[in-house]
Amino acid sequence: MSIRNIGIMAHIDAGKTTTTERIIYYTGKSHKMGDVDSGNTITDWMPQEQERGITISSAAITCHWKDCQINIIDTPGHVDFTAEVERSLRVLDGGIVIFSAVDGIQAQTETVWKQAEKYEIPRLAYVNKMDRIGADFFKVVGDIENKFKTIPLVLQIPIGNESNFEGVVDIILNKELHFSMENGIPKLTYSQIREEFIEKVILFKKKLIDILSQFSEEITQLFLEDKEIGLDIIKREIRRGTISRFIIPVLMGTSLKNIGIEPLIDSIVDYLPSPFEKSFSAFSLDTNKKILVDPNENKKLSALVFKVQYSSVIASHLYFVRVYSGEINPNKKIINASNGKREKFTKIFRVFSNKNEQIDFVKTGDIGAVLGLKFSVTGDTLVEENNNVLLEAVMFPEPVVLMSVEPERSSDEVRLKEIFEIISKEDPTFSYSESKETGQLIISGMGELHLEIILTRIKDEFNLNVYTGKPQVSYRESAGKIVKEVFEFNNIFAGKNIDFKIGMIIKPLSRGAGNKIDFECGIEPVIKSAILRGITSAFVSGIFGYPIIDINVSIFSIVCGANKISESAFESISGFAFHSIFQKSDPIRLEPIMLLEIRTPIEHTGEIISTLNVMGGVIHSVSNIGEYDLIKSEAAFEKLFGYASILRSSTKGRGSFTMEFSYFKEKLS
């Protein structure tokens, strides 16, 4: 049976979850259609999701259509949960990007599009909500072409528009498609194209052939010879163009009213790739080089842990894995190639949202979940012996907001830390630490909503009440200038007199460059590893108490005294040395700058812009969408706490906004 691993991506409220629920229902996996407003969707299973009507975690669903197994991951649309999108895209072979026919391309649409480009994921575009006032299919198609510099391939034209939208004309089949429900059973009927649509169908069929002929010699030849271009050839070439990311097939519908679902599922099977149609990149631990691995040829296990989820039912973590080659089964001896530790699967599951079906194995190209791993985290590679490869890990953005938390009862502090450990293991964008000055527990995340959801989980899922401080900005710090110095340590450490000198050069790097450590002197591998650990640990907190970013540390000399120095001593003293030298680099504090996209009624645009200017914001653009203006701007995150209330008041509740992290900038005051 063929497999499709697909993700459904979009801006919040574009209809991702509703579309996913319809696909699940139409493929027979569910016997009822979930509804977001009613809070009974299958993919949004967390209580917080059902309560808020948004997707927070990436739910995995397996269903079947026309002898094809489809693994669907419904991803969040809110920017606070970008990590869920990122780790989902890492393991997908194809995607559906959903656009609102009214709002078109929105802020998070651009974000997920860029993420999909990063992972080179072939996509379909689905223009949803065609029945809404202001729906404009062809404007959205034009925006996709102009904004994303891609070639949209229109496969359908609408029958009616807005409240009169009733179906589509399939350009490839030359048929009208009408959608209905009879006793809860979907019914798709075909009819001849009405006279009023024939001219437009001919025009778009010609456009379709013109686009395909840009990369298909076969279609070009048939066209030049004035021969009929068969349905099989057209579908095959659309598939080839989609997989190569030369084109983006575009479909439409209104998922809430069950219009357009069957053609969308057909297109998943017809145009998106199978896991066996693409080699995957890996790092060879034998040659220290990047390699391409063909899953058709390599039968040894290589799998990626892309998500860790705590189950309160079994009081254990469930590990979601994508198998790139070979097979997972309980008898297989495996190694975590990321840390060299041996692991074992005790149980294997097929996942259906928050329900699990135990199975015997997960084969090449498939997605499943396992129990029994002890030393693995998100992004780790699992292999069998003698398969020395490392898969590309999932990269996550830095947290930008922090908050102090303490339990109602001081006796619960240990338990609270244990809960934080559980959550941080499953959510790489959440972290916690203990303030050196106050002893308070500090949690960090991607935004106010992100932390709010976590605090709700602590109360509802773990039955623990906590007090919280106000949300604060999670700043960063970096070096203000180059500094070169030798740090001397001549003291007692762990009961031994130690004489140790280490010379470092600390240089500031450009924003976004990350931290780098290099050695200009010869050194034993064991000592080198200890020093690396010590300095890396020191990056966690600088002189202002914030993480240190964007610096280069060069070790140019190491001198040891007569007494033998332990690894732990090298590690600890290297951290002391770094902090001592870093203090002399005139450290600077950095604040997060956020990108904002504000949607406001036209009559309130002036007031919104004035408010942004007072906040020190920078306006990038103002564009019009019917009765609304779209304002794109940037502002310091510390100025944006409570902005939702300000906007709601200014626009009488009709305005909305999204924001996402852009970059760190030196804070001058």
Swiss-Prot record:
Enumerate the PROSITE patterns for this protein. G_TR_1, G_TR_2
Per UniProt, the keywords (alphabetical) are:
Cytoplasm, Elongation factor, GTP-binding, Nucleotide-binding, Protein biosynthesis
Every copy of the tr-type G domain together lies at: 1-276
Q: Name one GO biological process term.
A: ribosome disassembly
Query: Pfam family of this protein, just one?
Result: EF-G_D2
Is GTP-binding tagged as a keyword? Answer: yes
Cellular compartments annotated = Cytoplasm
An example Gene Ontology CC term for this record: cytoplasm
Q: Name one GO molecular function term.
A: GTP binding
> Which positions in this protein are listed as binding GTP?
10-17, 74-78, 128-131
SUPFAM superfamilies listed in its UniProt record:
EF-G C-terminal domain-like, P-loop containing nucleoside triphosphate hydrolases, Ribosomal protein S5 domain 2-like, Translation proteins
Q: Which domain of life is it from?
A: Bacteria
Check the record and name the InterPro entries matching this protein.
EF-G-like_DII (IPR053905), EFG_II (IPR041095), EFG_III (IPR009022), EFG_III/V (IPR035647), EFG_V (IPR035649), EFG_V-like (IPR000640), G_TR_CS (IPR031157), P-loop_NTPase (IPR027417)
Q: What does this protein do?
A: Catalyzes the GTP-dependent ribosomal translocation step during translation elongation. During this step, the ribosome changes from the pre-translocational (PRE) to the post-translocational (POST) state as the newly formed A-site-bound peptidyl-tRNA and P-site-bound deacylated tRNA move to the P and E sites, respectively. Catalyzes the coordinated movement of the two tRNA molecules, the mRNA and conformational changes in the ribosome.
Question: Which HAMAP family does the UniProt record give?
Answer: EF_G_EF_2_B
The UniProt entry's sequence similarity note says: Belongs to the TRAFAC class translation factor GTPase superfamily. Classic translation factor GTPase family. EF-G/EF-2 subfamily.
Q: What name is this protein filed under?
A: Elongation factor G 2
Query: Taxonomic lineage per UniProt?
Result: Bacteria, Pseudomonadati, Spirochaetota, Spirochaetia, Spirochaetales
Q: Which gene encodes it?
A: fusB
